[in-house]
Amino acid sequence: TGADPRRILLMTFSRRAASEMTRRVERIAARVLGDRASIMTEGLTWAGTFHAIGARLLRDNALEIGLDAAFTIHDREDSADLMNLVRHDLGLSKTESRFPAKGTCLAIYSRAVNAQAELEAVLAKSFPWCVGWAEELKTLFGAYVEAKQAQNVLDYDDLLLWWAQMCAEPAIVEQLRSRFDHILVDEYQD
């Protein structure tokens, strides 16, 4: 009988890996189902990156978690540009001694957010040359979050954080359990 492809969730880290995972399913389906393989592959609508799947689930459940479903997603480059704009607005791009560049600021922010760690600990461990800028970075990160909220923007870190928050809601978790029979995660060990 097999599994209903509409009830399978396939996730991976990169678009390339998601495409490869989908191609593998297509090859297996063609080998097993022959001419009927399209039934399997066309029904496989929940395959993609963690961020893409997360964005889709967040839009589906936005009202329940207090999120505007019309959010825009910033990729790393867009996020770095917004960080730079906020950095400039705060006058941090014109300091006497060189303030960290936008990419470094975004890396620090992302590390702190994803690790749910204190900024000072992140700086000491991974960015020791930026320790002297801790207070300015806190101000920058607060303004960056405000700018994202004002623009209804989520960055890649936000997608994962909101997804984790969404999965803390028992009703939503139950809905997800009833939606999927199989969850396949590529490179799970990573």
Positions of PLM-derived features:
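Coupling/switch/interface segments within P-loop NTPase motor domains and analogous charged loops
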Residues: 77-148
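P-loop NTPase Walker
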Residues: 1-69, 73-74, 80, 151, ...
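Conserved protein kinase catalytic domain
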Residues: 22, 26, 51-55, 106, ...
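Non-catalytic alpha-helical coupling and interface elements of nucleotide-dependent molecular machines
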Residues: 3, 26-33, 58-63, 84-92, ...
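Conserved helicase NTPase motor core
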Residues: 9-12, 17-18, 46, 71-79, ...
